Amino acid sequence: MNGKKLYISDVTLRDGMHAIRHQYSLENVRQIAKALDDARVDSIEVAHGDGLQGSSFNYGFGAHSDLEWIEAAADVVKHAKIATLLLPGIGTIHDLKNAWQAGARVVRVATHCTEADVSAQHIQYARELGMDTVGFLMMSHMTTPENLAKQAKLMEGYGATCIYVVDSDGAMNMSDIRDRFRALNAVLKPETQTGMHAHHNLSLGVANSIAAVEEGCDRIDASLAGMGAGAGNAPLEVFIAAADKLGWQHGTDLYALMDAADDLVRPLQDRPVRVDRETLALGYAGVYSSFLRHCETAAARYGLSAVDILVELGKRRMVGGQEDMIVDVALDLRNNK
């Protein structure tokens, strides 16, 4: 690591939305954001689980609007930057401007790993606003390291100053992560940062994040108690403990994070965020982690196994945004019984 400080990016209040069907109250947001700020994380991402304007029939309606959540977090932080997520085609530059006015200072512009070209307008506008602008290549396991690097180079060209490898499915292992960071490092400018967003579906969220840092990664996403889609993200407090053991600089208070995870976040989980039969199937089959709750609903409705639905979605190589296909797959499986 050469003595550099890691940038710690918390995603409890965005990816964690998936774990409770986007139902954080404003008071939940204030309490969690304040605890994270007191623990000195660098940024706190806030939005519907599917990003700005994700609240919809397809993805699930949120308890509040993105702007209400962002304002609630911005009101209580003194150190951390408020971040948000935007998926082109769901969120617009108008939504981005509103998020900026509400207090967001970092935006991660997210596309499928082979579709970076749809991010140009949003990345350019974010730079015009003066935002810390990040390219976020979702489902990075679905293309080769070399092709991922080409997509990263496109985002860099549009103006992104940091590019993320995003294991949306929790499907990659440490070798997969190393290969992708080496490919990015070979083509990106030295000043362009890289980041890692892990999911814990194969219990490799922390290990993959460590592998990323060993390959020069600058920013690590994690969440309190792993609060996130599927089996969750890399648990923040666990990653920080491991980073301490490795002698890495991160600037955060481990014990404050441990308290926040157990006292504030874990009690909110109506379904435990953990590796179990269904979440393991996500990682094994390579399925978008936020499909979990939708699949469980469909399985209950049609008298099916959620694992069977998830495995079939993996076979069909469904990607984020195709939540509407979950019911189609369930009906196909029921009719073929």
Curated annotation (Swiss-Prot):
Q: PANTHER family recorded for this chain?
A: 2-ISOPROPYLMALATE SYNTHASE 1, CHLOROPLASTIC-RELATED, HOMOCITRATE SYNTHASE-RELATED
Q: Which family does it belong to?
A: Belongs to the 4-hydroxy-2-oxovalerate aldolase family.
Q: Which PROSITE patterns match?
A: PYR_CT (PS50991)
Q: Which NCBIfam families match?
A: 4OH_2_O_val_ald (TIGR03217), PRK08195.1 (NF006049)
Q: What is this protein called?
A: 4-hydroxy-2-oxovalerate aldolase
Whose protein is this, by species? Answer: Escherichia coli O81 (strain ED1a)
Pyruvate carboxyltransferase domain: from which residue to which, for each copy? 6-258
- What SUPFAM superfamilies would the database entry show? Aldolase (SSF51569), post-HMGL domain-like (SSF89000)
Q: Name one GO molecular function term.
A: manganese ion binding
Q: In which pathway does it act?
A: Aromatic compound metabolism; 3-phenylpropanoate degradation
